[in-house]
């Protein structure tokens, strides 16, 4: 809904997903099974498909809102190549989400540039009470240049500790612009999250 069909590719190493794409006439690219992260997969795609920017919607965000893809595109147009990496975020409404180690939290400056991203509850206070926070939404835009930088380096120090690939960009000095998105997307990090997605889909119907 957000972009022309011929601009969309499914990047996968799984033949089952490839077969599904064939059945529904969806473009796909087979990537290697050596990709450690989704961004590694996009790096492989960037070597096969020429573009200035690559928008990546992770497969574990099945309810991603097409309007949020438009938000990324609008931000790219507005910033006019000022940033090489863009990442979605939204506010956190529940204490459970704030303290969940499965959910990366983000802090950023007044220019909406990412300062840090962590599985820990940030920002925190002396009383360890939830007050306000923001979480990552797994919608990204990468310039070809940023993917080349990402691709030539192995996992960086904080990236390895947190297991959050976007930290590699920060550690390599690449600015990350945060883009506000809706709260509708439900990331699937653990098996229990599948139930949440199915429940949400049933409610839509």
Residue ranges of model-derived segments:
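Conserved core of the sugar-phosphate nucleotidyltransferase
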Residues: 65-154
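Short, acidic, metal-binding catalytic loop of nucleotide-sugar glycosyltransferases
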Residues: 1-5
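Residues at the starts of beta-strands that form the adenosine-phosphate
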Residues: 6-8, 175
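Conserved alpha/beta core of the MobA/IspD/sugar-nucleotide pyrophosphorylase nucleotidyltransferase superfamily
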Residues: 131-205
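Short phosphate-binding loop-to-helix
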Residues: 9, 15-74
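Conserved acidic residues
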Residues: 6, 52, 84
């Amino acid at each position: 809904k957000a972009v022309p069909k011929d601009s969309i590719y499914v990047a996968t190493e799984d033949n089952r997903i490839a077969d599904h794409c064939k059945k529904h006439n969806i473009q796909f690219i087979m990537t290697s099974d050596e990709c450690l992260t989704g961004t590694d997969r996009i790096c492989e795609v960037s070597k096969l498909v020429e573009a200035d920017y690559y928008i990546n919607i992770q497969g574990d965000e099945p309810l991603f809102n097409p309007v949020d893809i438009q938000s990324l595109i609008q931000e790219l147009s507005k910033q006019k190549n000022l940033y090489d990496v863009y990442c979605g975020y939204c506010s956190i409404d529940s204490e459970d989400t704030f303290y969940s180690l499965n959910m990366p939290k983000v802090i950023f400056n007044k220019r909406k540039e990412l300062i840090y991203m962590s599985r820990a509850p940030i920002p925190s206070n002396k009383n360890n009470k939830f007050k306000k926070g923001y979480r990552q939404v797994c919608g990204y835009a990468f310039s070809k240049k940023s993917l080349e930088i990402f691709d030539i380096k192995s996992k960086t120090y904080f990236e390895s500790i947190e297991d959050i690939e976007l930290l590699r960009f920060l550690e390599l000095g690449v600015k990350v612009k945060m883009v506000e998105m809706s709260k509708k997307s439900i990331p699937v990090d653990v098996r229990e999250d599948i139930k949440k997605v199915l429940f949400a889909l049933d409610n839509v119907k």
